């Protein structure tokens, strides 16, 4: 189930994922005076992706009993860390 959910996320949010990669490259190449602005742009996009993933996770969790939901949440978060690490840093905060 989680694999399919992440497949859908990657398909639906392919543009966001590509923009995050580009923003990461721009941040890495930014001169010192532009680095803060580049990082803020990158962080905003990462935060958007993380929120979208958390919404996907939470919507499915609401269909599960409490014990199963906790196991699913942990498994989902691990899968995000492995498959979409850019969006995993704060996934547990949402």
Model-derived features: where do they sit?
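Non-transmembrane, amphipathic alpha-helical segments
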Residues: 1-8, 30, 34-41, 68
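Generic structural signal for well-ordered, non-transmembrane alpha-helical segments
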Residues: 7, 14, 40-54, 74-81
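Residue-level signal for secondary-structure boundary elements
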Residues: 14-17, 28, 32, 54, ...
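Short terminal alpha-helical segments
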Residues: 1-29
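Amphipathic alpha-helical binding modules
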Residues: 62-94
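Contiguous, amphipathic alpha-helical segments that mediate oligomerization or scaffolding
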Residues: 19, 23-60
């Amino acid at each position: 189930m989680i694999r399919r959910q992440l497949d859908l996320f990657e398909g639906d949010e392919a543009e966001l994922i590509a923009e995050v990669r580009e923003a990461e490259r721009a941040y890495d190449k930014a001169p010192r005076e532009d680095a803060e602005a580049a990082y803020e742009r990158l962080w905003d996009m990462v935060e958007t992706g993380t929120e979208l993933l958390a919404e996907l996770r939470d919507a499915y969790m609401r269909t599960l009993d409490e014990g199963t939901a906790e196991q699913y949440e942990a498994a989902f978060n691990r899968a995000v860390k492995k498959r979409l690490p850019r969006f995993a840093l704060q996934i547990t905060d949402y």
